[in-house]
Regions:
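Basic, low-complexity intrinsically disordered segments
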Residues: 1-516
Length: 516
């Protein structure tokens, strides 16, 4: 009863989630003075072969059944199928030309479907994103905006509706129209009484409504309309934070929709479907799942902005362009470690724990000779293919440090220990855990058990010499950072960066693993 009274007395919140439509593709279209809604365009790096993942697909290409993040060869195959069908309908089964504009293609069936493959320009997309964020700032204070990604934001509009004498829908439309007028990029928006509902309104409901003439879609949800519209919605993976693993586990227990989860949460103790079942499956995360099943989300914008994690980490990962053998992949791991330690020095952070994960290539099992030799565990990857189980390990350092020398030695030892020398490698991830500010690290007291057999005079001298070496290394790292910031990341390269199979030189010219 008290909970219901509290909800009644609490001011109704209004949250807006805005997602820029096919952002990367839209930017590339506008830079070519083309309409993002009618131009067939994919953003992908063709130099990486047709297996490369497309970063974005324009809306007109999606109309042919192409998903949002396909491999480039999937786009090629789909358009080939579309053109085969169009050819049969064309006069004399012959194309008279080609076009990458959906308006022209719809008007003339004798045209072959064409499309533009635009190489990614991540730095340029970041500039566009910053420009659009500044448009939001014309209407909303920064403390009420949470950038969720490069093309998506959450906005707490509660205190602005009275100021502007607008509804949440009108305010959302005003901001989207301003973005469209300034940049030519349209958007989809969701409005909800909490952050979860506005996200779901945008991700699920808005995508099933008809857009206006500018391609804008806006949907609204509150707790009750969420239950009416989406309790029977499938698949579960359409919902925020429900991945394939969650969905599979729920379906194995007879729960196929959010309505099923909600009903399970109020089941009686003597029934199979009850709250305890959810906690057995997901532990404390079941609390969040149950809240979301009912359309509740207690976390506010203020809490999101104030959140500070208990522990911090820095992660670096890459998918190799082709399978690497043990030695070539070890070189890449060494490069990645080197760059990570420079990043730690730049941020004045130190670590005492490194985690390494190495994923193996599918060729290890498709090649008959390699398959016969492999006796280890086999898992299924995200594409449903059999691959050797990945290698995963952790190494703890004796001290908190950002030293390239100490961390690299530890990572190389870990790599040799956990990685199968006979397997081809495709993915590498390195994480530095338990990060703290280097100034705090120096203040930490350390203790040591003394014994009668150690010459502590010699030991202190060795420690002093090690500190001197680490101090020289630190100055060298800082000098390298200064030069790289002034003249570019490739202004200074090490010998290993020029060896066959090295990737650091190319990655220095990328942002997020894609061309800058």
């Amino acid at each position: 009863m008290q909970i219901e009274e509290h909800r009644t007395m609490t001011k109704t919140k209004a949250y807006i989630a805005i997602d820029l439509k096919s952002f990367y593709a839209s930017v590339e279209c506008k830079e070519r003075n083309r309409d993002p809604l009618t131009t067939n365009l994919v953003v992908a790096d063709q130099s990486r072969t047709e297996k490369t993942i497309c970063l974005a697909v324009s809306p007109s290409l999606k109309n042919y059944g192409i998903p949002g993040r396909p491999r480039l060869f999937e786009v090629v195959q789909k358009i080939k199928e579309v053109n085969n069908t169009r050819r049969w309908k064309a006069l004399n089964r012959t194309f008279t030309g080609s076009s990458d504009d959906s308006t022209e293609l719809n008007a003339n069936p004798a045209l072959k479907v064409d499309y533009i493959v635009a190489p990614p320009r991540m730095e340029y997309y970041l500039e566009y994103s910053s420009k659009i964020y500044n448009i939001y700032l014309k209407y909303i204070a920064p403390e009420d905006i949470f950038p969720y990604s490069i093309d998506e934001v959450f906005i707490d509009a509660t205190d602005y509706l009275n100021t502007y004498q607008m509804t949440a829908r009108e305010l959302a439309m005003t901001m989207i129209r301003d973005v469209l007028k300034t940049t030519g990029i349209t958007a989809t928006a969701g409005i909800g009484t909490n952050m979860y509902l506005c996200k779901i309104a945008m991700d699920i409901v808005a995508k099933h409504i008809k857009p206006d003439k500018d391609g804008v879609r806006i949907a609204e949800l509150d707790e009750m309309s969420y239950r009416r519209k989406l309790w029977n919605h499938r698949p579960l993976t359409d919902f925020w934070r429900v991945g394939k693993g969650y969905a599979k586990k729920l379906e194995e227990h007879g729960l196929f929709s959010m309505g099923d989860v909600a009903r399970c949460s109020v089941g009686k103790p003597n029934e199979f479907h009850n709250e305890e079942l959810l906690y057995k499956m997901f532990g404390i995360n079941a609390e969040l799942l149950i809240d979301h099943a009912w359309g509740y989300e207690p976390c506010t914008m203020e809490q999101v902005k104030a959140y500070k994690p208990e522990t911090n980490s820095v992660c670096s990962g890459q998918v190799l362009h082709c399978p690497y053998d043990f030695d070539k992949a070890k070189l890449v791991v060494k490069e990645m470690t080197d760059l990570m330690t420079l990043d730690l020095v730049d941020k004045r952070l130190v670590t005492d724990q490194i985690v390494l994960t190495v994923g193996y290539d599918i060729e290890n099992l498709t090649d008959p000779d390699r398959y016969r030799k492999y006796k280890g565990s086999v898992t299924i990857d995200r594409y449903g293919r059999k691959v050797p189980k990945h290698a995963h390990g952790t190494t703890n350092l004796k001290r908190k440090t950002s030293s390239t020398m100490l961390i690299t030695d530890a990572v190389m030892e870990l790599y040799d220990r956990i990685v199968d020398k006979n397997l081809l490698i495709r993915r590498i991830n390195i994480t530095a855990n338990k990060l703290v500010d280097e100034s705090f690290s120096k203040e930490e007291e350390t203790y040591e058990q003394l014994d009668l057999f150690t010459d502590y005079t010699v030991k202190e001298q060795e420690q002093a010499e090690e500190e001197a070496v680490l101090e020289r290394e630190k100055r060298m790292q800082q000098t390298m950072l200064t030069i790289k910031k002034k003249f570019g990341k490739n202004a200074i390269l090490k010998g290993m960066n020029l060896q066959e199979g090295a990737t650091a030189k190319d990655r220095n010219e990328q942002i997020g693993g894609h061309k800058a």
